[in-house]
Amino acid sequence: MARLHSGKRGSSGSTKPLRTEVPEWVSMSAEEVQAKIVEMAKDGNQSAIIGNILRDMYGIPNVKLVTGKSVSSIMKDAGFYSEVPEDLFNLMKKAINLRNHLENNPRDIHSKVGLNLIESKIRRLVKYYKGTKVLPATWRYSPQTARLLVE
C-alpha cells in the first residue's frame, strides 16, 4: 500500500507472532502488570510508551495476553486516559511545534506544506472520531484550542 502524502510505495513490515497463551518466561502476574501500568500513567507516560517500557524492561511481549485488557483500557479504568485520543493529541502537538517554527521562519515554504498535510490529517481523524462517538459532535479543531489543549 502506498504512503499517504507521497508517491512512494510503503515498506513491508513484520507481523506479531500469533500467540494465544502467556509465554512461560513472563514472570509478572496480571495484577502486577496493571499496577505497573497505573504507576507509569501517574508519571505522565502515554500508552504507547508504557507498552514499549513493559516490552523492553520487564519482558512482557503483549499486555493483552497477560491481563486480558489493553493498556489504554487499563488506563481508562484507572482514570488516567485523556478525553482526546493519543494519536490526535500527538498530531496537534506536532502542528503547534510547526506553527511556532513558521512564526520564526515565515519563508519556509516546505514547512508550510507540511503543516497543511498535518492539519488535513487532523481533520480526517476528527471526522473519524466524531463518527465513532469518541469526540462530541460539536468538537472542532482550531490552532488556538489545540494550543490550549496541549499546553
UniProtKB/Swiss-Prot annotation:
HAMAP family: Ribosomal_uS15_A (MF_01343_A). The keyword Acetylation does not apply. Pfam families: Ribosomal_S13_N, Ribosomal_S15. GO terms for molecular function: small ribosomal subunit rRNA binding; structural constituent of ribosome. GO terms for cellular component: cytosolic small ribosomal subunit. CDD domains: Ribosomal_S15p_S13e (cd00353). Part of the 30S ribosomal subunit. SUPFAM superfamilies: S15/NS1 RNA-binding domain (SSF47060). GO terms for biological process: translation. This is Small ribosomal subunit protein uS15. Coiled coil: none annotated. SMART domains: Ribosomal_S13_N, Ribosomal_S15. Belongs to the universal ribosomal protein uS15 family. The keyword Hydrolase does not apply.
